[in-house]
Amino acid sequence: MTDRKLAEVLANATPFALPLAKPFRGVTHREGVILAGPSGFGEFAPFLEYDDQTCARWLASAIEAAYGRWPDSRRGEVPVNAIIPALAPHDAAAMAYRGFVGDGCRTVKIKVAEVGQTLDDDVARVEAVRSAQQSAAVPNPRIRVDANGGWSLADATVAIRELDRAAGGLEYVEQPCRTLAELAELRRVVSVPIAADESIRTAGDPIRAVQQQAADIVVVKVPPLGGVNLAREVVGAAGVPVVVSGAMDSAVG
């Protein structure tokens, strides 16, 4: 992109700061910039700790959305999951019930392994959400949990078995440990499918995760990969089921 074109992009940029309904791991607001271009709107909102190379991919994704071209849509709607933060059981159940009844979600992803909480807290939260699913008479209900890399290998082995029981069967557990080596070892000792999320941040990461037998599923976020077109290439090369996820985006992102 030329300096002149970049100046045009920045001239049509609008900063934003949106409060989160529920704080997430110390984050209370999402801050970023909305780009307005001939193709629509793009969102540039990398996290503050990211380096320049990572931020450049997020910017490329935003520019693609505002100035580039996406592939034609293949469907008019896609299923989504409700997300339950690391809340107390009663609050988690109430939030889940609203997602099931009000929003029509059949699948819920529950945050676990929160700093300062225990496995007992996680088990109680999952049991409460499962009860809410049953009360809402959700057809073909599914429960996923997301540890955001918060467990050691030993803790993950115990926690996954307990949470699988509490859920009546987990669909999968997302990023239970931090490294691909830990995920690969964990896959050998638990029966619940493992999804890699934080381990997938560049185009080559899904391939490495599969080659190292570290994931049954890969979670793809578009901004870290540089845009929709690059993300499609990653999905095609992964060779395992893919879940497309957000990155704490606004309604634009």
Positions of the model-derived regions?
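Catalytic core of soluble alpha/beta enzymes
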Residues: 112-253
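N-terminal capping/lid subdomain adjacent to the active-site entrance of alpha/beta enzymes
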Residues: 2-157, 161-166
